[in-house]
């Protein structure tokens, strides 16, 4: 299942929600969701072991109670997976690399193609204007 609401993509991994937010064109994962899937009991303590630069927070204004939500970078996600020492979590890592990451890679490629086409169109229009003036 795929759902985008308030700029957050929600996917399902084995009936568990994984909320993903794009920050600076990179995927960031809801720390609480990740900890639940990896069976990490204390997300706050898990966050302390992560690279601070790969942790962003947002305030969840759209739910009934406004709360702070932490989102972690893909590298921090893998750090948590590797630190968990649970063989079952390999399935989650495989799902991320085979199903989730390609979504963002395709999105980056599409944005680059669109940008290149817009630049090409601008150059063509400029060239057309120059030839019409001559």
Over which residues does each language-model region extend?
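An anion-engaging/catalytic patch
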Residues: 1-119
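Periodic self-assembly scaffolds
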Residues: 115-134
């Amino acid at each position: 299942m795929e759902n985008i609401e308030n700029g957050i993509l929600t996917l399902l991994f084995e009936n568990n929600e994984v909320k993903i937010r794009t920050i600076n064109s990179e995927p960031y994962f809801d720390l609480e969701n990740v900890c639940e899937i990896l069976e990490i009991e204390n997300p706050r303590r898990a966050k302390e072991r992560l690279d601070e630069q790969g942790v962003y927070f947002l305030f969840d204004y759209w739910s009934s109670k406004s709360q702070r939500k932490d989102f972690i970078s893909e590298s921090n996600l893998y750090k948590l997976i590797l630190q968990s020492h649970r063989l079952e979590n390999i399935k989650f890592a495989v799902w991320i690399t085979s199903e989730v990451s390609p979504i963002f890679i395709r999105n980056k490629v599409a944005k680059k193609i669109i940008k290149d086409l817009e630049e090409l169109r601008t150059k063509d229009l400029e060239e057309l204007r120059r030839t019409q003036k001559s």
